[in-house]
Amino acid sequence: MLERAIDSIGHRAHLLPEFRLNGVRTSADNVIGTLGGGKGLVEACFTGTAPIVGMFAVGLMRAAFDAALTFARTERRGGAVPIIEYQAIGYALADAKTAIEAVRTLSWRAAQAVDVQTPSALELALHAKVFGSETAVRIITDLMRVVGVDSYDHDMPLGDLLADALVLPLFDGGNMGVRRRQLHDLMRAPGYDPLAAAG
């Protein structure tokens, strides 16, 4: 039964329905996986989708970077030169681009590890999701500071990009839960090798 559909502030193309199932029964032939194995099945699905969240983050940051770079190259804000000529703006843009490339590389590595099923695939995928999603929120906010109050205007894409980025740490397994249940469990395991994900 559909309980409600969340009317999200961002990521508008993604439907967020809440369902409640009561008294649902099925035959053993229709069970996906094994009885009692649902948690593992769901976690395996998240392994494949976690790098995609990192890639979402890259796309959002890249769009925000392009908007901020264009603004910095064309706006003088009452000065004699475009604001990109000021060190503070250059540093902010350089830091943003560094973060974008770091998330891009981690997400690619994670996706490749999932694709070829390396032993470190789960850890890399989870790091891509957590690091990518949280970095996107921070970087888009930093790029909004480059633009200033104009970034809050509907004519600029930055506000919408931030609204989309804000959901990334929350969906597909919230980052706090990913840290607590998955990454923490990996690191607590007796055979955990912290260098395995390094390749």
Language-model features, listed with the residues they occupy:
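Alpha-helical transition-metal enzyme core signature, strongest for iron centers
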Residues: 58, 62-65, 93-103, 107, ...
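Short alpha-helical scaffolding segments that buttress acidic/His motifs in well-ordered protein cores
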Residues: 42, 110, 162-166
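Conserved catalytic-core motifs characterized by acidic clusters
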Residues: 5-8, 29-46, 70-86, 149, ...
